[in-house]
């Protein structure tokens, strides 16, 4: 038996490339949820908001998704830099939507943590850190720059500044925790998976040599 027929041990890896389809599906879910939310607030609750601008931002995300799917194909494996740029786009799109609908006063501001979570579990540390940093910057900008929260036309709701600072602090804590702890847990899990795969291949190779 020649050495060419023997299985080769895998090289250790700290991350595995994401499939484009994974981010595309998550983005479609975001598009559907954002569309339903905006239309329900505007027409269902009767709260005025900049509807055309909100729908334009949501449409931009949909067009981005369609373009990526046709250009690269759903099974394309994304390099870490490209995956990080896509998550950065998602953060900026969500940040723009939140800026039009109340900033951090909007209860859906918590969704800023979603791209951070995806990056922490699937990207190398450097790219995951940059995505987390962008989320923190967007949250900080939204704390001071945003349109009023959609509410009853004859009422103007004003949140205490300390409360808004508390929301900002909780999001920043979430960003730090997810980017550090989740990334470390995912890294350890990948190392264990790599070690098990290497052990299985080594045993298989030994069996073939002794056959």
Which role does the model predict for each range below?
Residues 1-18:
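Short, Lys/Arg-rich, polar N-terminal cytosolic tail immediately upstream
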Residues 2-7, 67, 71-73, 166-202:
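Juxtamembrane or sensor-core-proximal signal-transducing alpha helices
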Residues 10, 16, 193-211:
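A conserved signal-transducing helical linker
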Residues 14-29:
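N-terminal membrane topogenic signal
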Residues 20, 32-58, 74-85, 122-187:
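Alpha-helical transmembrane segments and their interfaces in multipass membrane proteins
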Residues 35-39, 66, 95-99, 117-118, ...:
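Alpha-helical transmembrane segments of multipass membrane proteins
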Residues 58-69:
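Central hydrophobic cores of alpha-helical transmembrane segments in multi-pass inner-membrane proteins
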Residues 92-103, 110-130:
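Generic transmembrane alpha-helix motif of multi-pass integral membrane proteins
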